[in-house]
Swiss-Prot record:
Name by which UniProt lists this protein: Heat-inducible transcription repressor HrcA
Record GO biological process: negative regulation of DNA-templated transcription
GO molecular function ontology, one term from the record: DNA binding
Keywords on record: Repressor, Stress response, Transcription, Transcription regulation
Taxonomy, superkingdom: Bacteria
Residue ranges the record marks as coiled coil: none
Task of the protein: Negative regulator of class I heat shock genes (grpE-dnaK-dnaJ and groELS operons). Prevents heat-shock induction of these operons.
Protein family membership: Belongs to the HrcA family.
Length: 350
């Protein structure tokens, strides 16, 4: 639900709702009219507050646990809070310094992603998640081919960010070592510094225009590159801190927690959510059922895309209970995205 769909609330009601949700996030206990009368900063009686809370419950922003006279926010209530009531608390200078120092020590993209997810988990006390840039977006530095047997070839691919990938490919024909060396020399001389997708497209285009001996070399290059230069997706997402959720009171249902950990293990659902946010500027928040997945109805996901050299590379975020400190985590996620993007622009990373 977006802010434009929120019910119209007068200033007094907004202040009561803001105070109630902030107190509930802090304490984890249902909030009653007496507590609000003491802490909302309004000159109204508990009886008046009770009437307002009843109205907020009628429109679906609050609910009443059976065992308490107080009220707690619904997912709808959290959405209104996040969209229009929360008062942001940006990370302090020391937190920003920690982020920058940790990410500055990363050696290569995968190391940076791991550091970013660990820092997000440590600073949020929940799960940190970072989607990896697609390898198609990265420039390759060097390639070598080694014949393993009559049908299989080992492709050793070094990217500009110092990552190395070894891939076993099965080309259409057997190649002599001298042929493999010739193709590798050609690819390194012509395409070092180019993105993978550009290389494949360029090879096919040149093959259509080539003749005689050059045509044979290009045909061999296309044959080998068609498999060797296809991006691998084994490291498509990095997560850290999943076990932190085991100590969260709001996620104490073991069956639901087991479902959540199965989602973490498969990664597919989390990646789908991150993909939905990759082109959205700024922070995007999914609260409970907004994820569209039953197994994630008890959690919230706060995400932001990270960019380098003007290009969106991926998304990072925090996964935690719906009762999370949005005022602190929303700006933290945005800051982490900015810092990671800056680190990705450092020489030797891309």
């Amino acid at each position: 639900m977006r802010a434009s769909q929120s019910p119209m609330l007068d200033p007094r009601t907004r202040q009561l709702l803001r105070t109630l949700i902030a107190r509930y996030i802090r304490d984890g206990e249902p909030v009653g009219s007496k507590t609000l009368a003491q802490h909302a900063g309004l000159d109204v009686s508990p009886a008046t507050i009770r009437n307002i809370l009843a109205d907020l419950e009628d429109v679906g922003l609050l609910s009443s646990p059976h065992t308490s006279a107080g009220r707690v926010p619904t997912a709808h209530g959290y959405r209104v809070f996040v969209d229009s009531l929360v008062q942001m608390q940006p990370p302090g200078e020391e937190e920003v310094r920690r982020l920058r120092a940790e990410l500055a020590s990363g050696n290569g993209t995968q190391s940076l992603l791991g550091s970013a997810s660990q820092m997000l988990s440590a600073m949020s006390h929940f799960v940190g998640v970072v989607s990896a840039p697609r390898r198609e977006q990265f420039a390759f530095r060097h390639i070598d081919f080694v014949a393993l047997d009559a049908r299989r070839v080992l492709a050793i691919l070094v990217f500009a960010d110092n990552e190395v990938q070894n891939r076993v490919i099965e080309p259409r024909r057997a190649y002599e070592p001298a042929e493999l060396e010739r193709v590798a020399n050609y690819l390194n001389a012509q395409f070092a510094g180019r993105a993978l997708a550009d290389i494949r497209a360029c090879l096919l285009r040149e093959l259509r225009m080539a003749k005689n001996e050059m045509e044979q070399l290009l045909a061999h290059s296309v044959d080998l590159a068609s498999e060797a230069l296809v991006p691998a997706d084994a490291d498509d997402m990095v997560m850290a801190g999943q076990t932190r959720l085991m100590g969260v009171q709001d996620l104490s249902d073991l069956d639901r927690l087991r479902e959540l950990f199965e989602v973490f293990a498969s990664k597919r659902e989390i990646l789908q959510l991150l993909e939905r946010t990759i082109q959205a500027p700024g922070v995007r928040i999914f609260i409970g059922e907004e994820t569209g997945m039953v197994s994630l109805e008890d959690v919230s996901l706060v995400t932001a895309p990270y960019t380098a050299h003007g290009q969106v590379l991926g998304v990072l975020g925090v996964i935690g209970p719906k009762r999370m400190a949005y005022d602190r985590l929303i700006p933290l996620v945005q800051t982490a995205a900015d810092v990671l993007g800056a680190a990705m622009e450092s020489p030797g990373t891309r």
